[in-house]
Each structure stands twice: as C-alpha cells, then as structure tokens.
Amino acid sequence: MKQISSSQNPFIKSLVQLQEKAKARRQSGTFLIEGQREIQLAHKGGYSIETILYLPDMLTEAQVKDLAGRQVEFIEISREVYQKLAYRDTTEGIIAIAKSKTLDLDGLELGENPLILVAEAPEKPGNIGALLRTADAAGMDAVIIANPKS
C-alpha cells in the first residue's frame, strides 16, 4: 500500500491544483471527489475512479475497497495531507480522483415530466457536490452543469 505523509509531495501538489484550478481539471481530464456517499454516487453513475486517498485512522482498507471496486489505486495519507486536499470542514477521511466525462444532451434519457437541475458555471467544486446531494435528495432525474465558456 502506497503512503504519502507530506503535503509537499509533488503528486499532492498536483491534486491541490485540481481542487483549485478549473484549467488543471480540464487539462488532466480528472477531478476530486470528497466523501463516501459522493464517491459511491460517482461510481454508480459510471465515473471511472482512478485513485482513492484515505486516512487509515478513519477507514480501513476493506471499507475503502468496497466503495469503488478493487481496480483502483489506494493511497494512505496523513492528516496533514488530507487537510490540504479536503474542501469541506467536516471530514470523512476519503478523497477520490475520478475521470471527467462530457455527455451530450442528446444522450440524456428522461421520462415524462422530468425534474432537472441546471447550474451555470458553479464557482467552487464543493458547490457541485452540494447541488448533487440536493438533487439526489429531491429525486431529480438529471443535473446539468453548463459552462458558457465552452
């Protein structure tokens, strides 16, 4: 099992860029997901989870592997590293790196009278997480994140 304890690690610095810079997310084709429920929803939604970083004092390796399958790289991180990467104040001790995907509206299969949430260019990645949790709780059929610059 790989371990990273320094927030100065080049890999961790690249993840901070993913967290903070839309350009880094576009260039790498990846983004960060924070939280067990969010990782499960992304996995269920067909997102490819590449790596999971977790605090071993909060989660066991077995718990982490149950979230996104066994074909994922798992990295134990220190609390210092987690605090550097975490967006939310409340902590679950887990962050995933996932592949981005772009979907066309033509491929969206909706039933009759669908309930859709449309968000135009959310400023912070954490806002998207809140929108997704709200949409899930409200039983929405789709969430569309629109970027007027693309």
Task: Give the location of each predicted region.
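Structural motif
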Residues: 30, 50-52, 73-75, 92-96, ...
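Short, aromatic/basic amphipathic alpha-helical patches
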Residues: 60-71
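A glycine-rich helix N-cap at a beta->alpha junction
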Residues: 69-87
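RNA substrate-binding interface of SAM-dependent RNA methyltransferases
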Residues: 44, 108-150
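Acidic/glycine-rich phosphate/pyrophosphate-binding loops and surrounding catalytic core
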Residues: 89, 93-113, 145
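Boundary-proximal intrinsically disordered activation/regulatory segments immediately upstream
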Residues: 1-62, 149-150
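Residue-level signal for inorganic ion chemistry
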Residues: 35, 96, 135
